[in-house]
Amino acid sequence: MSKNIVMLGLPGVGKGTNADIMVEDFKLPHISTGDIFRSAMANHTELGDKAKSFMDAGNLVPDEITNGIVNERLNEADVKDAGGFILDGYPRNTSQADSLESFLRSIQQKLNAVIYLDASEKTVTNRMLGRGREDDTPEVVAHRIDVAKKETMPLVEYYRNKGSLYTIDANGEVSVVYPKIKKLVSNL
């Protein structure tokens, strides 16, 4: 059976960090929209330049651009060969969630788990300011958290209502949080 997983949570909550460990344990590709966009920006692609203008202002990249990139990535051979994926940073709203569900249905797949890493704003703010990314200024961090709460939090209810949401307290260190994730994914 596939292990198709979405990681949800505020920016800086540890989605990417925990997903990277899951890659080692479960041999699933980690698909991070943030990494895709940062790579495109570094290479000054057309998409990268468009994404940069949104990200520099702390805003989300428009759905139509993001949906297309994610669908292309989910269709690549390594994802098909692995029998699953870990999505980090997508979907960010119910429109993207509907697009993902529709795409997965078109390839006879479905989501197996949506893991919501729940942490306080103080925790995620401190983590983001401590990671040293160019776009992590105090003002941009505060704005990103506000945007993410408005856009992402309805997803928590969306997936809770579908019965696929698993909430994990992510206020602690990775050494405390990750074993809970590993146990959950092992039982899928």
UniProtKB/Swiss-Prot annotation:
The keyword Glycosyltransferase does not apply. Its EC number is 2.7.4.3. Pathway: Purine metabolism; AMP biosynthesis via salvage pathway; AMP from ADP: step 1/1. Residues 32-61 are annotated as: NMP. AMP binds at T33, R38, N59, L60, V61, G89, Y90, P91, R92, Q96, R133, R144. GO terms for molecular function: adenylate kinase activity; ATP binding. It comes from the Bacteria. One of its GO terms (biological process) is AMP salvage. ATP binds at G12, V13, G14, K15, G16, T17, R131, G172. This is Adenylate kinase. Residues 130-136 are annotated as: LID. GO terms for cellular component: cytoplasm. Keywords: ATP-binding, Cytoplasm, Kinase, Nucleotide biosynthesis, Nucleotide-binding, Transferase. Its main location: cytoplasm. Catalyzes the reversible transfer of the terminal phosphate group between ATP and AMP. Plays an important role in cellular energy homeostasis and in adenine nucleotide metabolism. It is an enzyme of class 2 (transferase). It is found in: Cytoplasm. It catalyses: AMP + ATP = 2 ADP. Monomer. CDD domains: ADK.
